[in-house]
C-alpha cells in the first residue's frame, strides 16, 4: 500500500509543469493562493543575474559553475572627452536602464509578498537583499553615464556627487545584506582555516571573509573613488 502511494505521488510530481511547481511552492512555503501569483518577482530576480554577473567588466568571469578567471574592469569617463564613455558602453547602459525598471518591479513584488506571507518571511528578506546586490552595478553605471553626458559644469558636479553617493551606498548595501545572511550563514572562515588544496578555482575560495561575494564590485568601487580624487 505504501509503495503504491509513493508511486502515485511520484507520478503526480512528474505530471506537474514548471508553472504548477511554482504555484505549489508559493502556497506551501508562504501560504499564498496560487491565483494571486505572488512569487512572479522571482522570475525577474533570476533574469537580473545575467546582467549583474558581468556588468562591471569587459572580460573575465566569476560564475561559480565555470570557475573564476582574471578580469578587466570597465574604463571610467574622461572629463576631456564627454560622451565618449557612454558611446563605448552604450549597450551596457541600455541594459542597465532596463534592469533599473526590473529592480523596481521586483521591489514592489517583494513588498507585497512580505505583507501577505503567512510564513517564511526570512526567505523573502534574502530575496530583497539579493535584489539590492544585483542592482548595485546598475546604479553605478547609470551614475557614471549621467556624469559623462552632463551638459555643463554644474550638472557634471551634481552627477559626480551622485557617483560618490553610489560608492558610499555600497557599504550600506553590503552591511544590510550580510546582516540578513548572517542569521543562517557564517560570514568568514574561522582562524586557522586551510583553503582547498585540490586546485579547483572556486569563487568562494578567493577570500576567507565575504569579499568574494563582491568580486567585481569591491575593486570597481575602489577604482571609481581613486578616479574621483
Set out the residue ranges of the language-model regions.
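Single conserved hydrophobic/aromatic residue that forms the stacking wall/gate
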Residues: 1-8, 12-13
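Catalytic domains of carbohydrate-active enzymes that cleave complex glycans
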Residues: 17-229
